[in-house]
Amino acid sequence: LDEKRVFGTKKPGVQYTSTLSTYAVIFNLKKDQVGILRTDEHYVLPGGEMVQNESDIECLQRKIKEEIGANIEVGCHLGNAADYYYSPRDSQYVRNEGDFYLGKLSRQEEHHNHMFEWMSPNEAIEKLWLDHQKWAVQEGVNVMQTSSLF
């Protein structure tokens, strides 16, 4: 599962801002729906950019708490993937390298500045903005079908 994937097209002569992030593919208890965030601009997986000296797990725990007011139990590593894209919000080109994990919510409080929604994996893949996040949802589906993790 740790095979490196690269999505998007790196445009020649364009300066990219590199970011390292960690994301969670979170299934509901029935394992038939995935939780994704709806921001003002896009649908995205829970998680985000790491801060200095932060581990993948620490990043996920912090971001899930900030974004949806929940604690997360982090499961298996689904893989690492990168995506080249233009961020209209930040007015810059980005190369985002993400590590993706299965996750399970242990407690959810109020929603913060994002809307957390449950939807079928196919609908999530259709709505997610970034291709490496779409890939991760499919990887999560594959793992859930072949193992008893979570």
Language-model features, listed with the residues they occupy:
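Acidic, metal-coordinating catalytic segment for phosphate/diphosphate chemistry
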Residues: 1-23
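Conserved Nudix-box catalytic region and its N-terminal flanking loop in Nudix hydrolases
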Residues: 29-70
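Short helix-loop capping/hinge motifs at secondary-structure junctions, enriched
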Residues: 32-33, 107-111
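Short aromatic/basic micro-patch
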Residues: 44, 95, 118-119
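Active-site segment of metal-dependent pyrophosphate-handling enzymes
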Residues: 69-107
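NUDIX/MutT-family hydrolases
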Residues: 100-102, 109-140
